[in-house]
Amino acid sequence: MSQQTTIRKLAELVNTPVDKLLVQLAEAGMKFSGPDQVVTSTEKMKLLGFLRRTHGKAETSAEAASEAAKKITLNRRKLQEVTVNAGRTKTTVNVEVRQKRTYVKSENEGSGRAAPMTPDEERADILRKLEESRQRNLEEQQRLAESDRVRDEAIQRKREEEQAAKDRAEAERKAAEEAAAAASAPAPVADAPTPSAAAPAARSPSSPSSAPRAARPAGASPASRPAAPARADDRSNAAKHKTRGSHVMVAGVEDDDATKRFAGQLHLSAADRARRSNVRGKPTGRPGSSSSRRGNDNGRGGSQANSGPHGFERPTAPVVREVAIGETITVADLAQKLALKGGDVVKALFKMGVMATITQSIDHDTAALVTEELGHKAVRADNADFEDALLAHAEDAQGEATSRPPVVTIMGHVDHGKTSLLDYIRRTKIASGEAGGITQHIGAYHVETGRGVISFLDTPGHAAFTSMRARGAKITDIVVLVVAADDGVMPQTKEAVAHAKAAGVPLIVAVNKIDKTGADPLRVKNELLAENVVAEEFGGDTQFIEVSAKVGTGVDTLLDAISLQAEVLELKAVAEGRASGTVIESSLDKGRGPVATVLVQQGALKRGDYLVCGIQYGRVRALFDETGHQPASAGPSIPVQVLGLSGVPEAGDDFVVVDDERLAKDVAQQRETKRRESRLVASATNRMEDILAQMGKGEGQQVLNLVIKADVQGSVEALKQSLVALSNEDIRINVIHSGVGGITESDANSAAASKATIIGFNVRADASARKIVESNGIDLRYFSIIYDVIDQVKQVASGLLGVEIREEIIGIAQVRDVFRSSKFGAVAGCMVIEGVVKRSKPIRVLRDSVVVFEGELESLRRFKENVDEVRNGTECGIGVKAYNDVKAGDQIECFERIEVARTL
């Protein structure tokens, strides 16, 4: 620093404002008038000394040395390990404790001495004062430890008293139980040894030795009891040598209990630790002592091993669950019952070869297999509670069984006169009411004749109504097989015989149309012999009646035969009580709602009864017979129409009358759930089969979507079966929706979404449906005869198939020799040996009957003239385009491609 340093420059060097520096110089006794005055070195040192005195620092090195002589610093460092609880495990942490203590000699002590002390004397004086301070700390620590010991002893005495009282109460309870057991036990024999006197004394609650023995904890021997006071003395002795503010022992003795207790609180002083110990009231935790945390039964700090039933024990064996599975169950529900994740169940199904999603339903067998695969037990769930109640209602129809009318089903081939025969019997014109003169419904009628009441079921004879005929044979008592004498046995005749035999129903053969020329009843009998239908005149048990439905010949004889057969069968039923029976036909009437034609088989069906019919239920609002009248009730073997159901039931469903609507609703809902689950399982299976089929067949198969609506349920079934049967490997008929009733807006929307054709069988579309049909260009067709439906669908399906390209060989030429031409290259000299070779048609070159080239002709000549065709037995020259490897002996095959319309 230069001697000519100004105050401003000095302020910049020491990083101090100029005004502040001027003030400090003035306080140091140096007056300056401005910042531009020069500061000498002497003035700088004087300012520095002033500032050091102000901040308590020595001005010179000598003063600093004397200042350092007045100060002594003691540094201590200790390493120890602290155990920290981290959840269920314990972690050991290394902790280093550093202590620094500085002693400064006061000014008063230095000024009171006459002469300065030597360094040894100063050190001795410092050590003496430290010892005095340590003694004061030890006395304070000893006082705190003594108060802690007194408090612990009081707590220990209180716990021992509580434990003794508890043991005495337990001993009294055991003594009372033993006394009660001894009183209830049989008297001992005379020579039994008497109990010792020590036993009653041990059981007595007043025994002086019982309380200490009971109070002694398990596993603690008498020899270990005196160890507790000894450890307490050790702790009190160690506390005498402990320094205030530190847990480290001065005399080399450590307080283990305090170290463990305050292991995580090293920052606390001894006074704070003593105060917290008093507030907590913890036991000392000495091993082997009754006040130990591990041995304390009432303390909160008990170990996990002694926690009793509140501790969690890890299961050592897998849990095997018993899973109740119904007919179907979703994968998610099965996973929930198995206490597994849905993905685990899906993986198990994949391993078994079943491709299913978590929301998909699987059947009982598949669910049971995957349950067993996962190590659990599958049992079948009992879901038949409502069904059992319904069965009990059906069996509750008690009463006397009386004779009932027979149920007769008229069966036979189409146009053999079944409805005309029934028409003559009823004296009505039923046949004229059917479209096309053929029966397309099951007609149920009961006729009162001179021989009693007879219920007739008229079934259709067309091949499409197989299910109707089977249903009619199932619920009938007698089958009348109508066979035309001029036609003989036809396919549906054989089918009707098979249905009757399968149902175990007696058969009566009515040979119709005997008034026609060419009628041959004997031929009918001989043809039926091949179907194991043997006439009585041939030694069999089947009645053959020759009738004419047109003129009425033999009708009375037929009725007599029916009555005779009914008497042989001895048909009986309970005429009173709850009704039960079968649905023959069902439909949806726009004015009346769902209408079901039922045949009562037991009991009496009355208006107001609650009815369960398949998945439908309801209260009978009205009953109608075939003439339109409303009877009060319908007994056994009487067909009636029922109004009031919740929906259109399936033909062939059974119905039962129940007491209340609640049971009817529960049964219907349970059946609907089962049917829906079964349908989901079937649809899932069909989807997988369709995927695999499409993978195998590629995209070549065409699909024709249909929406079918009919007037009755039986017609819907017949249409679905007949149309789906038209499917083949090239086209598939897919019925996306079917139902009973008129064509609604919902049906039209379904057809528009799937680009389907709507078929209305004896039904029409309403205004809203027609509007959607017109706006979307949907193909809507109305029919009244099932023949026309099948023919039209065949035509539409054939149009989807398109045309098939076929190849037809029109001529073959034999190569005799090969010539070379500069214009055409190799020219084959040929002889046409078959058909005609045309210039405009494609050709193939065959060598040893193997095709070696396919192309077209470039030239066809006859005597150097170009010709269009060469016929059989004529020589010609053929130039093959883009092929020069023609050899003698080859054959040139000429063919043409033609388009052929494909049909079903």
Swiss-Prot record:
Region G1, annotated ranges: 412-419
The listed locations are: Cytoplasm
Would I find Protein biosynthesis among this entry's keywords? yes
Which parts of the sequence are annotated with region: G2?
437-441
UniProt entry keywords in alphabetical sequence: Cytoplasm, GTP-binding, Initiation factor, Nucleotide-binding, Protein biosynthesis
Region named Disordered: 103-122, 137-252, 267-315
For the ligand (GTP), the binding residues are 412-419, 458-462, 512-515
What top-level branch of life does the organism fall under?
Answer: Bacteria
Region G4, as annotated, extends over: 512-515
Residue spans of biased composition, Low complexity class = 178-230, 280-293
| Annotated region described as G5, given as residue ranges | 548-550
Which segments constitute the tr-type G domain?
403-572
Location of the region described as G3 in the Swiss-Prot/TrEMBL record: 458-461
Q: Which GO terms describe its cellular component?
A: cytosol
GO molecular function annotation: GTP binding; GTPase activity; guanosine tetraphosphate binding; translation initiation factor activity
What is this protein's function? Answer: One of the essential components for the initiation of protein synthesis. Protects formylmethionyl-tRNA from spontaneous hydrolysis and promotes its binding to the 30S ribosomal subunits. Also involved in the hydrolysis of GTP during the formation of the 70S ribosomal complex.
The cross-references to HAMAP family, in alphabetical order and at most eight, read:
IF_2_B
PANTHER family, per the entry: TR-TYPE G DOMAIN-CONTAINING PROTEIN, TRANSLATION INITIATION FACTOR IF-2-RELATED
User: Can you name this protein?
Assistant: Translation initiation factor IF-2
